[in-house]
UniProtKB/Swiss-Prot annotation:
Subunit-level organization: Monomer.
One Pfam family this sequence matches: GlgB_N
Name of the protein described by the UniProt record: 1,4-alpha-glucan branching enzyme GlgB
Xref: HAMAP family: GlgB
An example Gene Ontology molecular-function term: 1,4-alpha-glucan branching enzyme activity
Organism name: Prochlorococcus marinus (strain AS9601)
Enzyme class name: transferase
Organism taxonomic ancestry: Bacteria, Bacillati, Cyanobacteriota, Cyanophyceae, Synechococcales
Catalytic activity: Transfers a segment of a (1->4)-alpha-D-glucan chain to a primary hydroxy group in a similar glucan chain
EC number: 2.4.1.18
Keywords: Carbohydrate metabolism, Glycogen biosynthesis, Glycogen metabolism, Glycosyltransferase, Transferase
Length: 754
């Protein structure tokens, strides 16, 4: 061995490699041209012997200055065209040299865009990618961790020993390593040594697949290997604004909609049973449905109900079922509880085939403190703020993203693009927007920091939301972006170029609270609370509102919708039908949570599934029939959706009959002759000849009655419709003399002929 190449720095570098403190392994490892000869240095912990195979010759590598650092001299430049034979513990195996691949994976333009916060496809560079480099297949790893002292790939490939595969630090805090010996399905993590010497094992923030809980490693997975057949759907979606169409959303949690017996195993395509993922301790012997099973069972169910969209509570990978998915650790991976990314793609694909859009809950407001996640990622507060007064939700036990950091915003904005591009989703609902907008959200005085202007607005979060929505609609003009924003923050659904946040829909939390408060009141006392029903119209046109009865209203002791209602069972059913019908006739898009469509009795519990056995009883079938028919009516009557955000589409007839708790109003399309008359009676009293003024004489067909026998009601009504009478009331010369069933909503449509 030539002594001149055995310098002291080699020993020093080898010690750093052993101690996982080397951020520049390419400086010493791989092929080097030194003193007119080609030298290959190989780092092989625990190896007994190392040889180099090159051009049908074998060259023994000698240990130099360290027992695990081996060196061989080759007669010419080997490039990548050599293999390493390793004898370890009596077993020999052959592999390619990871450190023979020296080219940068993340180019200058990529780094620049990422540092700016404008790399909208950063997932195509970050994370683990199956590629072919110099005719050799393998996995390219790339991660951002500027403050780390060293990073290694750990996994089954090296017995989870970080001494084997140190990564190369590049410009911009990027770390890279090509692993020719790894393949699809391999599990891995990043072992990060901090400047203080602490070691963290982190899952891949950009990982496309992760292990099933309670394990939390990342899994190498192909990205673009799915054949979509929804091009017509996507083209139609992006050709026009979706908010001017009927939108009726079924919000649901995949893990608690329906469970299956563990005895009934899901079979893979090859006939092998898949290992079941237990559902919960509440029902021993049950398991979660897989994405393919949900494709076969959920999609036909939602289609039969007539909903236009499914909204999925978060399916990004999360470690704890009890978080409902809102504490995300795997932002770029559909949870593996239900199957593979491609199986989820097929779920979306099938939804589109059946005319159903898919909305995902997206959680850019906070993240959990799990050790394998983003928290203190490289030994510093990389993704979160360092000061807990702005970087932590103590009540939730989660951390807040540092939106002022370009790379963090890039991580989130690209994640938004990722779900639309890679999984063809149609919309997002952004969770807990208010917690992002206000620095003092759920914080007492002294535990928050004012902004640069002395206010409580989180200016950085505002800019992030504006950027996210701007980029989203730039790429996907037909997308839905829905804000769960519970305050009166202005211009939530106004365009960003007008100073708005850029969403195109906002949950109407005020309507929801008012209506639930109202319907929980004994009907005899509702006359004193009429304003709760009518107030929403006074602000209805300040935003593009979506009416939502969500999961948040059926947990934590709040009871499910049916059991919020006062009175005996008959009144509970009737009140529920009346509320749902009123919701479908009120301006705004619609969302209800699973179980409401058939009158679930128990509170929602993430560990359980729905009370499907209730459908054996007629009143529950009746509520389901009501939802089915409301969705058909809703889609067939443009007056119920076409002018949701235009005052032209709504007009009170009478909202002041407090003593009877009756309200009446009209909905209309652009054609002024297309009026729908809606009359709601929110007491158990029946009115036999209640007069309602209408703008045009003629016959008004009763097109819906929530008291119909098909829905479990008393079947009181108007025998199919009513002819107007000449009677001056409500500022109209014509009137309808109607029978108003108890606790009901009736809908009438003017027809020129009977």
């Amino acid at each position: 061995m030539i002594e001149t190449i055995q310098a002291d720095w080699i020993k020093s570098e080898a010690i750093n490699l052993e101690n996982c403190c080397n951020d520049n392994p390419l400086k010493i490892l791989g092929p080097h041209f030194y003193e007119e000869q080609w030298v290959i240095r190989v780092w092989m912990p625990e190896a007994d012997e190392v040889k180099i195979n090159f051009k049908n010759n074998t060259y023994k590598a000698e240990s130099i200055n360290h027992k695990w650092l081996f060196e061989a001299i080759l007669p010419e430049n080997p490039n990548h065209n050599y293999e390493i034979n390793i004898l370890r513990g009596g077993v020999t195996h052959t592999q390619h040299d990871p450190w023979s691949y020296r080219e940068e994976w993340m180019g200058e333009v990529d780094r620049h865009l990422f540092a700016e916060g404008n790399h909208h496809h950063i997932w195509e560079k970050m994370g683990a990618h199956l590629i072919e480099e110099k005719n050799q297949k393998g996995v390219m790893f790339c991660i951002w961790a500027p403050n780390a002292k060293s990073i290694s790939i750990i996994g089954d490939i090296n017995s989870w020993d970080g001494r084997h595969h140190p990564m190369q630090k590049r410009l911009g805090g990027i770390w890279e390593l090509f692993m020719p010996s790894m393949q699809e399905g391999d599990t891995y993590k990043y072992e990060i040594r901090t400047q203080q010497g602490h070691i963290y094992e982190k899952a891949d923030p950009y990982g496309f697949l992760h292990e099933i809980r309670p394990q939390n490693g990342s899994i190498v997975s192909k990205l673009k290997n799915f054949n979509w057949n929804d091009s017509s759907w996507i083209s139609n979606r992006d050709s026009s604004s979706q908010i001017n169409k009927p939108i009726s959303v079924y919000e649901m949690h995949l893990g608690s909609w329906l469970h299956e017996s563990t005895d009934n195993k899901y079979l893979e395509n090859n006939g092998d049973p898949r290992d079941p993922v237990p559902a919960a301790d509440l029902k021993p012997g049950t398991r979660l449905l897989t994405y393919p099973e949900l494709t076969k069972k959920l999609i036909p169910y939602v289609k039969e109900r007539g909903f236009t969209h499914i909204e999925l509570m978060p399916i990004s990978e999360h470690p704890f079922d009890g978080s409902w998915g809102y504490q995300v650790t795997g932002w770029y991976a559909p949870t593996s509880r239900f199957g593979t990314p491609n199986e989820f793609r097929e779920f979306v694909n099938k939804c589109h085939e059946e005319g159903i859009g898919v909305i995902l809950d997206w959680v850019p407001g906070h993240f959990p403190k799990d050790k394998h996640g983003l928290a203190f990622f490289d030994g510093c507060h990389l993704y979160e703020h360092g000061d807990s007064r702005i970087g932590e939700h103590k009540e939730w036990g989660t951390l807040i993203f540092n939106y002022s950091r370009n790379e963090v915003r890039n991580f989130l904005v690209a994640n938004l693009v990722y779900w639309f591009e890679e999984f063809h989703i149609d919309g997002i609902r952004v969770d807990a927007v208010a917690s992002m907008l206000y620095r003092d959200y759920l914080r007492p005085d002294g535990e928050w920091i004012p902004n640069e202007n002395g206010g409580n607005e989180n200016i950085e979060a505002v800019k992030f939301l504006q950027q996210a929505n701007h980029v989203l609609f730039q790429h996907f003009p037909g997308a839905l972006s829905i804000a769960e924003e519970s305050t009166t923050w202005p211009m939530v659904t106004k365009p960003t170029d007008m100073g708005g946040l850029g969403f195109n829909l906002k949950w109407n939390m005020g309507w929801m609270h008012d209506m639930l408060d109202y319907f929980e009141i004994d009907p005899w006392f509702r006359q004193f609370h009429q304003n709760s029903v009518t107030f929403s119209i006074t602000y209805n046109y300040t935003e593009n509102f979506m009416l939502a009865l969500s999961h948040d209203e059926v947990v934590h002791g709040k009871s499910h919708l049916l059991h919020k209602m006062p009175g005996d069972d008959w009144k509970k059913y009737a009140n529920t039908r009346a509320l749902l019908t009123y919701m479908w006739t009120h301006p705004g898009k619609k969302t209800i949570f699973m179980g409401m469509e058939f009158g679930q009795r128990q509170e929602w519990n993430v560990w359980d599934d729905l009370q499907w056995e209730l459908l054996e009883f007629e009143p529950h079938k009746g509520i389901r029939n009501l939802i089915d028919d409301l969705n058909v009516l809703y889609k067939n009557e443009p007056a119920l959706w076409k002018n949701d955000f235009d005052p032209y589409g709504f007009q009170w007839i009478d909202c002041n009959d407090k003593s009877n708790s009756v309200i009446s109003f009209m909905r209309r399309e652009n054609d002024t002759n297309e009026w729908l008359v809606v009359v709601a009676n929110f007491t158990p009293n029946t009115h036999e000849s209640y007069k309602v003024g209408v703008p045009m004489e003629g016959f008004y067909r009763e097109i819906f009655n929530s008291d119909g026998s098909r829905y479990g009601g008393s079947n009181k009504g108007n025998l199919g419709g009513k002819e107007t009478i000449n009677y001056n009331i409500h500022d109209y010369q014509n009137a309808l003399e109607l029978a108003l069933p108890p606790l009901s909503v009736s809908i009438f449509k003017h027809q020129s002929k009977k």
